[in-house]
Curated annotation (Swiss-Prot):
Role, per record: Allows the formation of correctly charged Asn-tRNA(Asn) or Gln-tRNA(Gln) through the transamidation of misacylated Asp-tRNA(Asn) or Glu-tRNA(Gln) in organisms which lack either or both of asparaginyl-tRNA or glutaminyl-tRNA synthetases. The reaction takes place in the presence of glutamine and ATP through an activated phospho-Asp-tRNA(Asn) or phospho-Glu-tRNA(Gln).
Its EC number(s): 6.3.5.-
HAMAP family (UniProt xref): GatC
Subunit and interaction comment: Heterotrimer of A, B and C subunits.
Keyword Nucleotide-binding in annotation: yes
UniProt entry keywords in alphabetical sequence: ATP-binding, Ligase, Nucleotide-binding, Protein biosynthesis
Alphabetical GO biological process terms: glutaminyl-tRNAGln biosynthesis via transamidation; regulation of translational fidelity; translation
Primary gene name: gatC
Species, as recorded: Pseudomonas entomophila (strain L48)
Chemical reaction(s) catalysed: L-glutamyl-tRNA(Gln) + L-glutamine + ATP + H2O = L-glutaminyl-tRNA(Gln) + L-glutamate + ADP + phosphate + H(+); L-aspartyl-tRNA(Asn) + L-glutamine + ATP + H2O = L-asparaginyl-tRNA(Asn) + L-glutamate + ADP + phosphate + 2 H(+)
Protein name: Aspartyl/glutamyl-tRNA(Asn/Gln) amidotransferase subunit C
Length: 95
């Protein structure tokens, strides 16, 4: 699947990216290169291969599930611009 210039323009519009005329060919080529790599990976036969979450057979050392620091909510809320009932109040950004 190859992207056309119009596809890249539409994607840029949806992502609210301001691309100029000089950038469009470079971005189109870069995206097509990425999609080509994805096509190559999808073409590989992986039948019988067990999926891996991590390429190495290692495990994470877990620490005990204990509280390691004190509750500092009151201290943080004392310096916050606006709080109410233990919550931080922020300006509305979406109508």
């Amino acid at each position: 699947m190859a992207l056309q210039r119009s596809d890249v323009e539409k994607i840029a519009h949806l992502a609210r990216l301001g691309l100029n005329e000089g950038e469009l060919p470079r971005i189109t080529d870069a995206l097509n290169s990425i999609l080509g790599l994805v096509d190559q990976m999808q073409a590989v036969d992986t039948t019988g291969i067990e999926p891996l979450a991590h390429p190495l057979e290692t495990t994470q050392r877990l620490r005990p599930d204990q509280v390691t620091e004190s509750n500092q909510r009151d201290r943080y809320q004392a310096v916050a611009p606006s709080t109410e009932n233990g919550l931080y109040l922020v300006p509305k950004v979406i109508d």
